[in-house]
Structure formats: C-alpha cells, structure tokens
Amino acid sequence: MSLAHVLLTSLIEKPSTGIDLARRFDRSMGFFWNATHQQIYRELSGMQQKNWISTLEEHDSTSRKKTYQVEQLGRTELADWMVKQSPPAQLREELMVRLRAEAQLGGNTVLPELERHLILHKENLKIYQTIFAKDFAN
C-alpha cells in the first residue's frame, strides 16, 4: 500500500483541499497510515501528474486553494490495487520484546504498561466501531 492509495480513498469519500485532506487524514486514515502534511502535498502533486486526480475550479479567483477530486484513472488505479495481494505487515512491537525480557528477568514490571496498552486499544476499538457504524450503516 502506498500513501497514494490512502489519499485516493479519502478523496473518493469527499473532494478536498490539501489542508482539509490532511486534517481529515489525522482523524481517520491516520489510525492506519502515518504521513506528514508535507508528504501528503508531495503525493498529491505526483498523483496529479499521473492524472489520477485533478483540481476543481475555484469560484474566487484570488484563492490559491486547490480542491482535489479523483479522476477515472485514479479510480482504475484504486480498483486495480484493491484486488492485489499484499504481504502481512512486519510487526515491530517494543512491548512484546519487553514481555520476552521480563520472562527472563522476572519482576512483573511490565504489567502496568500492558494494562495501559489495553486501555488505549479499547479506546481505538471504540473509534473503529464508530467509523464502521458510519461507513457500513446498511
């Protein structure tokens, strides 16, 4: 998966300016993919060069805002990408290494951190359930 596919998905949901897309990204796709605002803008430029996206005309001629929308080539790219196989993500989890170390050293020192992670995962689960309910209401 690439940032371009994340952005195509977001733009299919709603045509957006770069800043609006970056803000929405932080609240939704950011749970699954990390990107800086600079990376988002650079990727939008590349996607526009590939004719995957275009900009809508702004009615205010003094505005420099660009509202991006997905073009047919972008939809085709996203559809092609959706059916491709992908390898499982490489798991790199510091907490799991701490558990292995604790098994050797003892002390039961990792339990508070495990409990904190459990709380954080439950909070994320609530967010994911809200997104699911909104996106798959039917």
Name the predicted role of every residue range.
Residues 1-90:
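Basic helix-turn-helix/winged-helix DNA-binding cores
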Residues 3, 25-28, 102-113, 138:
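Short amphipathic alpha-helical segments at helix-loop
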Residues 14-15, 33, 103, 107, ...:
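Flexible interhelical turns and helix-capping residues at alpha-helix boundaries
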Residues 22, 44, 114-115, 129:
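A generic alpha-helix structural signal
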Residues 48, 75, 122-129:
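Structural signal for well-ordered, non-membrane alpha-helices
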Residues 79-125:
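Amphipathic alpha-helical dimerization/coiled-coil segments
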Residues 129-138:
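Acidic interhelical loop/turn segments
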